[in-house]
Amino acid sequence: LHSKASNKPGGWFTKLIGCPESFTEPKDIYKKLKERGMDYITITDHDTISGVLEIAHYPEVFISAEYTVFVPEEKTSIHVLVYGIDEHIHEDLMKLRDNVYEFVCYLKRKGIAHSLAHPLYAVNGGRVSLSLVERFVLLFDNWEGINGSRGERLVELEAKIAKAFSGWEKIAQLEEKYKMCALRERPEIAWTAGTDDHSGLYVGKTWTKANAKSKEEFLKEIKEGRTQVGTDKLGYERLLNTVGVCGYKFLVTKNKIPSQIETLCECMFKENNSLIGDFYLKSLFGLNCSGDSLFKEVLNRLPSITLQKLRNSFTPDALGLALIGLAAHFIPIVILSAQRRDEVQAKMIAKSLGINSNREFRLAYITDTYFDINGVARSSQTVRKVAERFNLPIDVIVVESCSVAINGEEKKLKVLHPILEFSTPYYQEFKLRIPSVISIAELLKDYTAVHVATPGPFGLLAFLVAKLFYLPVTTAFHTDIPSYAYLYTGSEDLKEFLYKALSLYHNLSEAVFVPSQTYARTLIERGVKPEKIRIFKRGIDTELFNPNKRERNYFQRTFGFTPRGRVVLYVGRVSKEKNLDVFVEVAKHFPGETFIIVGDGPYRAEVERNSPENVVFLGYLSGETLAKVYANSDIFFFPSETETYGFVVLEAMASGLPVLVSKKGGASEHIKDGVNGFLAEDLKEYIAKLSALLLDEELRKTFAKNSLSYVLSLDLEKTYLEYLNMLMGGQKSEIITSFFRFKREDAGYEASIIPSKGRELLSFNEMLQDAK
């Protein structure tokens, strides 16, 4: 617990600007502690007792301090809380701080109560190692079990680590290891607790209890380890609010705070907000919350408010305010990152001691596109459905505006709302949405691993936050963005820059999931490390897409036209990268056949303008209607050269269509040329191979049969479970907890997955071997 006497900066930034650690008056601390029912009171300022001396005349106050003490072998400093001292002892202790052994020996010799402060939290950017913790075990009988500015996770880890060293036998082993005598008086570590408050907001909200009728008895109980500890709710909001209060008071002392911001801070940091203050916050930020979350919610809304002002009036003042708002918005993330770093260090120590410190596995599946109509969105939707059906520890997290209606409560789906939304250059229909970074952090702090499916604004921000939180992150390459950029801009430099950026991005991940060998080779050629690459396949819904949906006169009854000749179908986005100019040119060579385009996009007007009359546009279709269009066509023609996988090719094959596909891109990997389809690479070859298909009905039937057999081997649930197994297995977690039952059916190889009882749980690969 700190007062204004802790007047030195605590970190590199506060040192840079000269901001002290606390501005709280000792008498205010005393008053609050009495109001909150504390029987005995002290203040533990850093390396000084000047603060507590201001209230030392009260009978329930005892003098204490938090000393920064050096550990020579570890070349690091630690903090030691010392209770019930006087000015002479303080002078002695200040002289002994350069050597922890001399410091603790003095305390033991004098019989002074003391406790090791925040054992698993590094001081001044140092590192807490296993050897340092083992020296703690040899030196200190009391540890600070709860530190009010740290999270609950660190409290749990500290208790587990301390328990691992219980007993004189363990202490003797460490004496032998470090060739030194322990200064311990008890075989078990006892606990103290403190708020570590620097702001005055949390005074008395974390405490140490003991059965005592005087402060002398209380100090004796601490010394002999007969204490209990307690706290109000912990959370990073405590430290965040402390930073806010200290920053605000520092600016006030420097007369550098605008009156509007001063009013805002007064409303936020008063413990009992007035009705006027509540109205002010609600009108300015739309806030109804109070307490610990208030400052966080203000920071959460700052970017959207300041950016809106900037859009309304682009002035230097508005720009400055927007930049300040964005910078302030990242304060909670910096604090959470620091706390997570301490947790990771503690977990490493626990692991080295054989302590299971892992949280229950939870994967956040991040995607910029979910409600849109594209392959990546459909894949994300299937991930959610499979995760729900098999109760996998996976949530799909998306960003969407309030205007999108979600049918019912979709399990395994979390939706963030954007603070900024804009159309993609060259593709106005596709929106890029940016949520607040705080909302991302609030979600990801509860997960143990992250998969970023898309490198859009949301995906990149989630990637950054996950890295700052020391979470394992995997990525995916679903879309050839550099090639798209080149097709639209003609800039080779932009294409090269984007490939370099993507290579850096993927190399920073644990693994990159690529849907085809073609693009795996491309990424490796562009600089992605080969050991990062994971190939994954996905099936499609063969109940929805199948040949049995062919109907007589379907196009006449549904769309009001009768195709002439045979139907050659394209399904997909109508955009430049899909190479639809080739589709149109081929159609011109077959005026007696009908060429249908299903889909929409930014290139539609251009394609329609250049199309002959035998090309028909049906727009966006989905579900049963799309499935019937597939089944009632005769040939599927897909000239796109930038497909990373080609879902629509699989849908066509499942619908019993022979397919003609570009040799370039990932979609070609589904085709064995001349067996279940044709591959082509230029206009002449497309025309020749399409002509062969149109003229030879038996060839079409053979291709269709072989296509269907191939697609049925890519069972939807089986392939997605295998994919999700890789995602989760990459994090060394418990993974699929259902069992597979395989059966052969006339239509091909089908997998069905059922829960099972009474058997050992297996991973997908183990289950597959077991079934074989």
Predicted ranges, named:
Residues 518, 539:
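Carbohydrate-associated surface elements
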Residues 1-20, 87-208:
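Domain-core and long-helix interface of multi-subunit machines
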Residues 641:
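Aromatic "clamp/platform" in nucleotide-sugar-dependent glycosyltransferases that forms part
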Residues 605-625:
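Nucleotide-activated donor-binding/catalytic signature segment of Leloir-type glycosyltransferases, i.e.
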Residues 444, 621, 628-633:
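Short alpha-helical donor nucleotide-sugar binding micro-motif in glycosyltransferases
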Residues 658-661:
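Short hydrophobic beta-strand element within catalytic cores of glycosyltransferases
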Residues 1-77, 201:
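An N-terminally biased module of ancient metal coordination in phosphate/nucleic-acid-related enzymes
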Residues 673-674, 678-684, 692-698:
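Conserved acidic donor-binding segment of nucleotide-sugar-dependent glycosyltransferases
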